[in-house]
Amino acid sequence: MAHPIDIHVGKRIRLRRTLLGMSQEAIGAAIGVSFQQVQKYERGVNRVGASRLFEFSKILDAPVSYFFRRV
C-alpha cells in the first residue's frame, strides 16, 4: 500500500511535469529511468528517493519543497 506522502509527492511531480508540457518519456530520459518508472513515481507506487527527488527538482525547475506543499 502506498504511503499518502508518496502519493502526494507523485501527484506534485505529475502536476509540474504537465504544467511544463513534458512527457513521461522525456523526463524519464532526463533522469535515466523508463517512462514506466516515472508512472510508478507519479502514482506513488514507488517511493522517490532523496537523490532522485533532487534530480526531479532540477529538471522540473522547482525547489524540493514544491513537492511537499499542501501536505
Residue positions per predicted region:
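Short C-terminal boundary/hinge segments that cap the last helix of small helical domains
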Residues: 60-71
